[in-house]
């Protein structure tokens, strides 16, 4: 059957949709992504949206225009199901589903049900969550499946000489990682800097600056705007420093890697804080909030962790307590049961 997946906004919404689409295609379904993302290697229909944080009038105009386009394309494709992944980019397609009386299933990646998913909550036949406890996701329609990621645990390797530190900035507030996190790494004690190798996701405009900074401190590094071999990077990491987006957390936790999470302070409903807290409460990560004390707190924490390999191993083992899981199979079972 034809299934439309409504997604967009950030990679945290898009990547799970792509993972699910690939799994559904294997089962013979025709999947099409309705999204605002233009560089994804899967069949998709692009909606001309812009981010709501910019020009408000432009956003509202493009949102209304996208609603008309989504309605037209949806009526033309006649899908049997529309799956929403949250974010403003999913709104036009989910609205079309409601108008055309097409069954809606929602997937929430974060520990707080997003605003668009809350808006369509009553219209949905099923709401699947990535965390065992999700704020605003209550009732018989809600089921914990897990997030959708292509990561498998490979065991935590003991660091004999070099400690590999993986830094994942994500798409929101990446300049903080380029500037503050890199500066903290360079201010570590000499005996720590001599042992570490940094693999870091940087914004394109800052790669040369950050590389020069590390070089001046004698720190071995690999920098890139995007890593297309994230599973391999995680497998080699002894510690990960990351934003607390749900998909990043799922990948890091399923890879059984200890982490330091720095939640993006402007995330809607402060969901990154609650994402990180869930993992911290399980002993698999430590959270550092982005505030005036962030540089000092992060520096002290990294000195402690990078000089205590046993603590890193304990955190890696605690990832098994988080209940984070790859939910593709469970989700497909749930929607099959719901639509049967």
UniProtKB/Swiss-Prot annotation:
Protein's pathway: Cell wall biogenesis; peptidoglycan biosynthesis
UniProt-annotated location(s): Cell membrane
A Gene Ontology biological process term: carbohydrate metabolic process
Binding site for UDP-N-acetyl-alpha-D-glucosamine: 10-12, 110, 171, 272
Superkingdom of origin organism: Bacteria
The reaction(s) this protein catalyses: di-trans,octa-cis-undecaprenyl diphospho-N-acetyl-alpha-D-muramoyl-L-alanyl-D-glutamyl-meso-2,6-diaminopimeloyl-D-alanyl-D-alanine + UDP-N-acetyl-alpha-D-glucosamine = di-trans,octa-cis-undecaprenyl diphospho-[N-acetyl-alpha-D-glucosaminyl-(1->4)]-N-acetyl-alpha-D-muramoyl-L-alanyl-D-glutamyl-meso-2,6-diaminopimeloyl-D-alanyl-D-alanine + UDP + H(+)
Function: Cell wall formation. Catalyzes the transfer of a GlcNAc subunit on undecaprenyl-pyrophosphoryl-MurNAc-pentapeptide (lipid intermediate I) to form undecaprenyl-pyrophosphoryl-MurNAc-(pentapeptide)GlcNAc (lipid intermediate II).
The name this protein goes by in its record: UDP-N-acetylglucosamine--N-acetylmuramyl-(pentapeptide) pyrophosphoryl-undecaprenol N-acetylglucosamine transferase
